[in-house]
């Protein structure tokens, strides 16, 4: 969706509804070492031994990995994240270290089509695509801005204020997750 459609706010709210899972943000300037992991330099210098230091992908396991402006991320890194998440494993072979760890993350990505789009073969790898339209009603836009500001001013107060609504929605999502294994796609 376009700028100002609260895509980032919506993505952050997913963590609140996901039963204690954390939201980790993948920065656009991420390096391969930051993403996949690398040698723990401090450990190597102080003890003279090589040790693997997990990257963002390892920390995102059992959590939510958020990519804001995914269309601006280097495409080879985005493809590698999608590959690892699809395979359920990240294999790291670098600097004399061989490491393998599980990857089980919920991936949420946003993009502003004004700044370019993702190729269809990349979009196809996401489970769902939602086109967010900009709100034109002034009252709705004001409400979104007020809530975003309230959240940034005092997160705990914001959570208390909307706790009942959040709990109700989280319960609905939990019930839907329970039903999901019983869902069969028709021909």
Mark where each language-model region is.
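Walker A/P-loop
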Residues: 1-28
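Conserved Walker
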Residues: 2, 45-56, 70, 87-103, ...
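Conserved AAA+/SF3 P-loop NTPase catalytic/coupling segment centered on the Walker-B
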Residues: 10, 31-32, 58-85, 117-125, ...
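Short glycine-/polar-rich loops that comprise or flank the Walker A/P-loop
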Residues: 19-21, 61-62, 87-89, 103-105, ...
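Conserved AAA+ ATPase "SRH/arginine-finger" region at the nucleotide-binding site
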Residues: 24-27, 129-139
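Structural recognition of the conserved hydrophobic beta-strand(s) that form the central parallel beta-sheet
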Residues: 25, 65-68, 83, 92-93, ...
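Short glycine-rich substrate-engagement loop in P-loop NTPases that contacts/grips substrate
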Residues: 28-60
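Basic, amphipathic alpha-helical bundle interface domains used for macromolecular binding and assembly
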Residues: 136-137, 142-187
């Amino acid at each position: 969706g376009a700028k100002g459609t609260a895509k980032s706010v919506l993505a952050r709210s997913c963590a609140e509804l996901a039963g204690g899972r954390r939201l980790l943000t993948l920065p656009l300037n991420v390096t391969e070492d930051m993403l996949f992991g690398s040698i723990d330099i401090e450990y190597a210098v102080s003890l003279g031994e090589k040790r693997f230091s997990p990257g963002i992908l390892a920390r995102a396991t059992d959590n939510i990995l958020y990519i804001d402006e995914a269309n601006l991320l280097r495409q080879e890194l985005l493809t590698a994240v999608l590959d690892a998440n699809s395979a359920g494993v990240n294999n790291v072979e670098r600097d004399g270290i061989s490491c393998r760890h599980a990857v089980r993350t919920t991936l949420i990505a946003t993009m502003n089509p004004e700044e370019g789009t993702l190729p269809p073969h990349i979009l196809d790898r996401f489970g769902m695509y939602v086109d967010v339209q900009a709100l034109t009603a002034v009252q709705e836009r004001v409400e979104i801005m007020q809530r975003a500001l309230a959240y940034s001013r005092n997160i705990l107060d914001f959570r208390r204020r909307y706790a009942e609504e959040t709990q109700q929605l989280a319960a609905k999502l939990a019930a839907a997750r329970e039903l999901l294994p019983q869902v069969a796609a028709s021909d």
